[in-house]
């Protein structure tokens, strides 16, 4: 399915080289102020820097066709369309499946009728519509003091400082919104860009790790067992092309700790509010928010489109062959994924709010 969510839902339509891509966001409360300049900013961030991004340069001019009136959401489905203006289909072969892409699985899923150009419906290009819609969900949350931010934690063997060192502050998260390359440490950013450039020159690509924080969530959001925050957010994050892993808080490192090391002890802050001394559980206990920042990390695989010669199979002849991918592709999709993760996370959190507080939570 190309639909995310239960009560606040996002449906994506379109193909990489089709005429347009569309997102329909349903279930968002009425009265949310829509900042089109904020949407434009996030779409610019998704386009990325020239070092890591694809040479395909789409203007990403968007049209809001429904669900917004006089600058505010109406409470009815929001339809956003972005037209494709810079597609080049000349480099794509219908029968040679590209290693690491969904070409092979799509061939069997859709019996050979799939649009293979640029990955079709599986392309990261579709995420532009996702970001436009998700930014409106972020608007709804920001009005309530809930801020989401993601930085590149690791790329090309170079690590940025984690949120944990200085705490996931709202100021840090807001700072990330102005970054086209979301890295706190300037020297780390410089070294990451060098690694990406080297991979591109070698005809190769890099994977990476992104770290996300949600600040301002109230206690009690989420459900036990199968409706927990981890599961709801992970469902959305795993829908993003290239995502191969998600961990919350200390994640897999918890498996190597003792209980005395892993447990987040409770204390009172200066305002007599209950907080935890550490945040190994990432702000979630029993699937429910505990009031601390929700922290999670996402693993992004290397861009599968590389210019090195690779072995494959020609599906029209069922013979082994070789393929060289000559299209315009990212050297590191992780560099552009931060804003996509923010957008998906915002939609998931809005869905969780609606489940707990009903459809008018943003205006009440």
Question: Regions from the language model: what does each represent?
Answer:
Residues 9, 80, 305-364:
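Internal helix-turn-beta structural module
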Residues 12-13, 19, 203-320:
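Glycine-rich anion/phosphate-binding loop at the beta-strand->alpha-helix junction
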Residues 19-31, 124-146, 150, 227-235, ...:
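Alpha-helical support elements that line or immediately flank enzyme active sites
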Residues 1-57:
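N-terminal, positively charged regions that mediate nucleic acid binding
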Residues 95-120, 311-329:
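Short acidic, glycine/tyrosine-flanked loop/strand segments centered on an H-E-D-like triad
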Residues 109-225:
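Glycine-rich, mobile lid/loop segments that gate access to catalytic sites or pores
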Residues 42-105:
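Glycine-rich, N-terminal phosphate-binding loop and its surrounding beta-alpha-beta segment
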Residues 9-14, 114-126, 219-223, 279-284, ...:
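A short glycine/serine-rich beta->alpha loop
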